[in-house]
From Swiss-Prot:
<feature type="binding site">
    <location>
        <position position="449"/>
    </location>
    <ligand>
        <name>Fe(3+) 2</name>
    </ligand>
</feature>
<feature type="binding site">
    <location>
        <position position="113"/>
    </location>
    <ligand>
        <name>Fe(3+) 1</name>
    </ligand>
</feature>
<keyword id="KW-0410">Iron transport</keyword>
<feature type="disulfide bond">
    <location>
        <begin position="507"/>
        <end position="521"/>
    </location>
</feature>
<feature type="modified residue" description="Dimethylated arginine">
    <location>
        <position position="42"/>
    </location>
</feature>
<feature type="disulfide bond">
    <location>
        <begin position="473"/>
        <end position="549"/>
    </location>
</feature>
<feature type="disulfide bond">
    <location>
        <begin position="589"/>
        <end position="603"/>
    </location>
</feature>
<feature type="modified residue" description="Phosphoserine">
    <location>
        <position position="691"/>
    </location>
</feature>
<dbReference type="GO" id="GO:0005615">
    <property type="term" value="C:extracellular space"/>
</dbReference>
<keyword id="KW-0964">Secreted</keyword>
<feature type="binding site">
    <location>
        <position position="414"/>
    </location>
    <ligand>
        <name>Fe(3+) 2</name>
    </ligand>
</feature>
<comment type="subunit">
    <text>Monomer. Part of a complex composed of SLC40A1/ferroportin, TF/transferrin and HEPH/hephaestin that transfers iron from cells to transferrin.</text>
</comment>
<feature type="disulfide bond">
    <location>
        <begin position="367"/>
        <end position="399"/>
    </location>
</feature>
<dbReference type="GO" id="GO:0019731">
    <property type="term" value="P:antibacterial humoral response"/>
</dbReference>
<keyword id="KW-1015">Disulfide bond</keyword>
<feature type="binding site">
    <location>
        <position position="138"/>
    </location>
    <ligand>
        <name>hydrogencarbonate 1</name>
    </ligand>
</feature>
<feature type="domain" description="Transferrin-like 2">
    <location>
        <begin position="364"/>
        <end position="689"/>
    </location>
</feature>
Amino acid sequence: MRPAVRALLACAVLGLCLADPERTVRWCTISTHEANKCASFRENVLRILESGPFVSCVKKTSHMDCIKAISNNEADAVTLDGGLVYEAGLKPNNLKPVVAEFHGTKDNPQTHYYAVAVVKKDTDFKLNELRGKKSCHTGLGRSAGWNIPMAKLYKELPDPQESIQRAAANFFSASCVPCADQSSFPKLCQLCAGKGTDKCACSNHEPYFGYSGAFKCLMEGAGDVAFVKHSTVFDNLPNPEDRKNYELLCGDNTRKSVDDYQECYLAMVPSHAVVARTVGGKEDVIWELLNHAQEHFGKDKPDNFQLFQSPHGKDLLFKDSADGFLKIPSKMDFELYLGYEYVTALQNLRESKPPDSSKDECMVKWCAIGHQERTKCDRWSGFSGGAIECETAENTEECIAKIMKGEADAMSLDGGYLYIAGKCGLVPVLAENYKTEGESCKNTPEKGYLAVAVVKTSDANINWNNLKDKKSCHTAVDRTAGWNIPMGLLYSKINNCKFDEFFSAGCAPGSPRNSSLCALCIGSEKGTGKECVPNSNERYYGYTGAFRCLVEKGDVAFVKDQTVIQNTDGNNNEAWAKNLKKENFEVLCKDGTRKPVTDAENCHLARGPNHAVVSRKDKATCVEKILNKQQDDFGKSVTDCTSNFCLFQSNSKDLLFRDDTKCLASIAKKTYDSYLGDDYVRAMTNLRQCSTSKLLEACTFHKP
């Protein structure tokens, strides 16, 4: 055989000679069996994808070595469990999950399960009362049965930094923890039902091993609590009547029905995920490769090569139990993918010293957007005596993400962002009240405010029905009065999301910079580069900014009913506003008529929910306590706060809170949907297909 022919055949076998390096995914393997499956994967991909993407194989000795290899650009991808996804995301690795394995069907893919604590209904202890109880676990080192509950209980365990097993043995009166060190910690195996060498075995030889085994330990009365996953009760008790005998222990030390696992769980445990470099990580090529691969080699496909089978081992390259792949949204870093509870659990288990007792103290880290809010927040922090600290982000979605991750604790949001925050797992804590005063204010949340479309009185021909090709001014994309309500109404008329083509030009901070909806924006007076950003660096941002846009450039402004009044007749002394009269402006009615701005009650687009403070569920009680004290010290009820600090006043407009806030009122039911109301949630759900929110896409990735 001639050398040239021999070389071409070798290239065909290797699948590398003509492969474009940018279209080649270097898959990292950790064993000979994985390397062999990877080689088969490579050859079969070459057979079906002549133009790529291609696969090459890199062999290392451990997943941690693979993480380092990818970080150093010596490999491109590897599949990891949640704990290793966490390690991969930490500095200096800086990797991110790009593709998730899912279980179930394409129509209802599941990328996580809930770790729960199950108890019998006829008992009355809570999660913070488990000391001295008898516990049932799936197995040592397993997520739902060991890692999550031990992390949740970490601060209560005696000397956990010495040995988690010893700490657990001293915390519970007796346990069944299959796979535990029975000779060193006999109490961890005391409840197990296996005989002889099978007692506490790391397999089904121990009757109380695994999810069903741990639940059996509880059912048979051996234990008081079982740490399992949310589906375990349903799998073992198909009769709903039998399930009524059991309850879940919630993180807030309450109990709920086993049906309410989405509201009462210890942590959400994510599926295995493929990780890649955050920068230059080939995430689109990796997805293209795996998407093609699952179409040809996935579950129930006729090809001899199967992605989710491991003939010479178990879970080689991918989990054998996986049913397919889903692309992870680009905004989703490792912390958002894993979730706050799971990340906190992993952090606790990795503590090398006792938990800092100061973490138990109630203080609030407020998230400020941009320089002006940070300046006010720092001043607030100084007057608060340490109760308030400050964190900064460039925009609202970054702040929401920081609160989700525990990098910040709270902020006040309008209804549109509150919807996004709610979808991201945050809860409303206190509502801003704008009209109620006196003693009843803090106990009576208001119904909401009016969203209006404002025009100049001199533009007499403009009405709600002829806004096409007009110049529009918005508070920001995804905000209630400035975007969600008017664009939701507009969508119902034009049946598409091309709002940038409907208006001739506009300023809607948060829009793509090349959009016509950024054309009117003017940015910061301190220099260029801040045009159309959704924070106070854009002078047309927010209620006052959108109204200023109308005064200086636009035809219509979408704001709240009080905006015109607050910026006319001497109420705003800035140069652009000081000579304005409210009579110079009117509001548009949906029936095509117009009315004075003082008659907005009879001429508005819709009623929007008042702004509200949001936080994580675990921090909500602390936030409410601190803010009630802060408004007592610096709120509107204080006779003269100007010599110190005024919580509801700003040097510019609406920094941290709306300036017209009278008080922060307690909310009876702290869920985003009950606070926003059915009509508003329905409108937001309809408008979601027009949403450009990357954070909302990330937060809704894990389906309920």
